[in-house]
Amino acid sequence: MHAVVRNYTGAGAKELFDLLEARKGEVESLIRSVTGFVAYSLIRTGEGGISVTVCQDKAGTDESLQVARNWIQENAADLDTAAPSVSEGSVIVQLS
């Protein structure tokens, strides 16, 4: 499995997470459509928020990055949210 973590801070980050929370049904549906989807979490932080996506392979997490980027461009461009810092890698342990 492969995971990608997007950390949103700075300009527009808190507002973006307000919007994601308000439209969580739409976000859930979109992320579940990603090929090889395993798990997804949105975590609110003091500076904005973090998303964690786990897929069966890197192709899935790459697709999730594009899906997230497209959704933000289509639905939150007016927030001028700073690009997230992105970390990714192989999953060593996955518990639920």
PLM regions and their residue ranges:
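Short S/T/G/P-rich N-terminal loop/turn motif that feeds into the first structured element of a domain
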Residues: 1-52, 56-70, 77-96
